[in-house]
């Protein structure tokens, strides 16, 4: 789902003059998995297909829960390991309770908490409460996921998923080695002066026909049973300056996350020239159109959505549920020490409303033109964050 969504979100960015992109496939995956627990019929089938899931929602919930439970918590950066925090919450109108089976499924998979609020009388108060929850879960990197007007008296349920990641490199860069250099913008858009991190250390680099891949491992806590770095930032760099979209199409055709895993570098090699820019990106907006583009349609249609397993029956005049919007926020900063990144996804429901050839030694890796990046958990292959850098000097936000 990560690459398919990236393509759709990129199309939307281009239409508004954007370029850079960061989002969290895992956060979106978690929120949509919660929704599947209350879906039936075509609504459920479309969600399962988009998530690349098994044929049953129970199997999906089990798989998703295993990924989330594998994320280490706590203040890992204090002990040299990553700090990873994932949180999930449900807010329902106090006049209609969440069905026990739906609540229990969300709690079992994601330790989701459920809260009753008064959407009818105090929608703004409910919005502020949810925003405060997201801000706390993301260490204030995302302080407002729900803009004014996004929660109304028609709102019946809000599902939120947030993730925070902070880790240091296994081999940090020296700040004194960071220097300005030219970064070439897509489509002949000229050059910009960007801050490039540099290193003469051996790196995890693999060279393929038309592109190279860099893996930069993060520090992990010492363990008798797990000695290899668990998290890494992977950079897919096309050989051609304007080759980002061609590479993205090739990755998607190759199976998305499968392509990513098959092309992950396995060993360090000597490098010649090595440069990668520092970057700081953010995203904030609706991903409804992007989700519709990957086949999730019925859940947004007031006449077709079947979310009958979400809420208890209300008054006879209460209309059926549908999803009015899915909002997503993400922010990432990559620098000499490591990476800090966070994301949140909010679902608002309303009533009707392959192995590489050995890389030559030494090999150059100069990321001076647009590239794709992924923060991955290596044992499961889970993609926590994904995106691409078109201009590292522009902290673009949708």
From Swiss-Prot:
CDD domains: serpinP_plants. Keywords: Protease inhibitor, Serine protease inhibitor. The reactive center loop (RCL) extends out from the body of the protein and directs binding to the target protease. The protease cleaves the serpin at the reactive site within the RCL, establishing a covalent linkage between the carboxyl group of the serpin reactive site and the serine hydroxyl of the protease. The resulting inactive serpin-protease complex is highly stable. GO terms for molecular function: serine-type endopeptidase inhibitor activity. The record marks 352-353 as: Reactive bond. One of its GO terms (cellular component) is extracellular space. This is Serpin-Z6B. Pfam families: Serpin.
């Amino acid at each position: 789902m990560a690459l398919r969504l990236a393509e759709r979100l990129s199309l939307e960015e281009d239409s508004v003059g954007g370029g850079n992109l960061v989002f969290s496939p895992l956060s979106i995956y978690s929120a949509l998995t919660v929704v599947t627990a209350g879906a039936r019929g075509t609504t459920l089938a479309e969600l399962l297909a988009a998530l690349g899931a098994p044929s049953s929602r129970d199997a999906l919930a089990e798989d998703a829960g295993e990924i989330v439970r594998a994320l280490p918590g706590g203040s890992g950066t204090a002990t040299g390991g990553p700090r990873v925090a994932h949180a999930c919450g449900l807010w329902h109108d106090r006049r209609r309770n969440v069905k026990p089976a739906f609540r229990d499924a969300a709690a079992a998979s994601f330790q989701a908490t459920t809260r009753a609020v008064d959407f009818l009388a105090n929608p703004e108060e409910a919005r502020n409460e949810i925003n405060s929850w997201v801000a706390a879960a993301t260490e204030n990197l995302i302080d407002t996921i729900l803009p004014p007007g996004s929660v109304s008296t028609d709102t019946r349920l809000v599902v939120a998923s947030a993730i925070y990641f902070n880790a240091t490199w296994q081999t940090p860069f020296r700040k004194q080695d960071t220097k300005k250099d030219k970064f070439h913008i897509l489509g002949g858009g000229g050059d910009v002066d960007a801050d490039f991190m540099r290193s003469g250390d051996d790196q995890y680099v693999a060279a393929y026909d038309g592109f190279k891949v860099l893996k930069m491992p993060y520090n992990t806590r010492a363990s008798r049973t797990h000695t290899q770095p668990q998290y890494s930032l992977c950079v897919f760099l096309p050989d051609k300056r304007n080759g980002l979209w061609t590479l993205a199409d090739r990755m998607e055709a190759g199976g998305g996350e499968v392509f990513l895993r098959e092309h992950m570098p396995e060993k360090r090699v000597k490098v010649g020239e090595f440069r990668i820019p520092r970057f700081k990106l953010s995203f904030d907006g609706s991903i409804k159109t992007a989700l519709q583009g990957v086949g999730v349609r019925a859940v947004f249609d007031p006449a077709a959505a079947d979310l009958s397993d979400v809420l208890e029956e209300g008054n006879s005049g209460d209309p059926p549920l549908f999803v009015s919007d899915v909002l997503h926020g993400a922010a990432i900063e990559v620098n000499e020490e490591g990476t800090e990144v966070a994301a949140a996804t909010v679902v608002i429901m309303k009533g009707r409303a392959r192995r590489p050839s050995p890389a030559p030694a030494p090999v150059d890796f100069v990321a001076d033109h647009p590239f794709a990046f992924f923060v991955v958990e290596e044992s499961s292959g889970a993609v926590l964050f994904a995106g691409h850098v078109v201009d590292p000097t522009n902290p673009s936000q949708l």
